[in-house]
Amino acid sequence: MRIGAFTAIAAFPLWAAAQTDWPAYGGGPAGTRYSNLTQIDRTNVSRLRVAWTYDTGEGRGDPQTQPIVINGVLFGVTPSHKVVALDAATGKLLWKFDSGIAGRGPDRGLVYWASGGDRRIFAAVQSFVYALDAATGKAIPDFGREGRIDLREDLGRDPAGQSIVLTTPGVVYRDLLIVGGRTPEALPAPPGDIRAYDVRSGKLRWSFHTIPHPGEFGYETWPKDAWQSSGAANNWAGMALDEKRGIVYVPTGSAASDFYGADRLGDDLFANTLLALNAATGERIWHFQGVKHDIWDRDFPSPPVLVTVRHDGHAVDAVAQTTKQGWVYLFDRATGKPLFPIEYRSYPRSEVPGEAAAGTQPLPTKPAPFARQSLTGEMLTNRTPEAHQWALERFRDLRSGGQFVPFSAGRETVIFPGFDGGAEWGGSAFDPATGLLYVNANDLAWTSSLAENQAGASGRQIYLTNCAVCHGDGMAGAPPQIPSLAGIGSRRTRAELTAIVRQGAGRMPSFPNLRARDVAALVEFLASGENKELAGEEPARVAPRYRFTGYHKFLDPNGYPAVAPPWGTLNAINLNTGEYAWKIPFGEYPELAAQGMKDTGTENYGGPIVTAGGLVFIAATNFDRKFHAFDKRSGKLLWETTLPMAGNATPATYQVNGKQYVVIYATGGKALPGEPGGGVYVAFALPGNASIGGRR
């Protein structure tokens, strides 16, 4: 078995004098994305200049990486999931690790652990987690098997038939690496067990079943023996760790299949749940389920943030969790008691045969939502009279009733905010000095529906069963998040398409359940449109009676959102009071701004950081490719610059040799086809002794 290749460019002392670091994804185990550095502040941020760049030299991917910085060394990931160590002051490459496994999907960061002279970087590549020597980049052979563990194992199912990848880094508690994983949106999918591995040996130390086994709490909220066949309820968004209390906070997503739950009737604990687990043992301490029996893909999409707030005159250690719907939930960290009341409200039942939507869902009474949650005709675009009229006519054909309206068979339903939030994977930042939580949000409407599956086995039916859940019946996708497959036969060879189906690519999982004949029929349908019937064959698996018809953005004929602005926002919420300090549109379409239509806000992917220097740094905006610095108290824009590609990631800040840097990974991972894409780390600092690392 190949462990992987590494390239050592220069040795470096990890035992050097202590620096002010960014030691973990989210800035630290609490995930506050806060730095106490003050060299760059409100008075001088306008003087920021590029200090160095590191160009990975790779093409478009969507890594979404926030680097970590330890003792003057920056550790990051390339679009193809190679791991790099850079001199954090110059951008000079120190070493590079190549697992030899192809990958282009999200890889949001790395995990660092040290004990004495043993210093390790844990890096995820597809279904594997590698332990690397932080000084050399070499895989550590006594971790797992030849330097890696396989996340498809230890799930109680045949590993060969599982698709699970680690897209967001886990956390380290003492000598345990605690991880979740991303699973497919539809069955078959593995269970979303939360697992802890020994950081030295790679042995599994504990596992928490998010789909409970017989005798475990929550088992009765699923059909009998669902643990053997149901899937997902997984943690893909990240975690937060209270090191003092020894509690890890784990938000989970929906159960598979996402949109039709006839085979998982019940509340489905612990899907869509914020879990507080004993980090040493995996035992449940408390939990809160945000969506019961989710049939809308309303995962908890962001890592929790551990905060301390003033509540009823007392300091309370709390955990804040943002949602796709635009809510912020706030709980006492130790007990799970909500700091603001939560009301259970009634919602309509599903009309789809076999489905049974939950009768009530929990909603916080404060803070108010940071995204709009119901669409009416008065809220449609006025960009042009023609766009408004088109949107109005289209809207009349849609079902729109606010949150938790079940999808129907045939007529499309509005989901607002859309499938990408509200909040997303970039997370939020918390300022302990002010009690303000900073969260960026998408504010677009999407639509979709269900359709009845047809009997038989053919290339098109295999597509509808396995692929249409994302790409839609007509293969249009929802660019830039989900690419169109129309005409893909002219862009990819059949061999390439076969490899993608087998191995996965980007957000797309692999499909190990499909037989060779199924894959061949599917590939032929994608490449040529030929709907090859598999005579005498049954489908590779029994499909559910109804399937999701795909993710459809509600856009006007010119490709702009069909709702009125703002289409993206940046929000500052006082968690002491539950009130908003400020809210601003976030992002622009350059072509609309040139026509005088400014401050519309846009889709944004990536999160903020906040500093003691009085600043909020954030890139994230899809179309203007800007990196911004805002006054954290007022929301006033103090500085911005245009990146080589959209910064669809979360920045980091650190100090080396007395100099503060702010770094962002520019990839264009969420950009539209034809827009720049690649992988460039860009570090900024105040003028003086700047250098250019160049392409490595």
Task: Report residues per predicted region.
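Mature N-terminal segment immediately following signal peptide/propeptide cleavage
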Residues: A17-G59, Q66-V69, K92, L570-I573
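Extracytoplasmic electron-transfer domains, predominantly the class I c-type cytochrome c fold
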Residues: V165, I247, Q454-A457, Q461-A535, ...
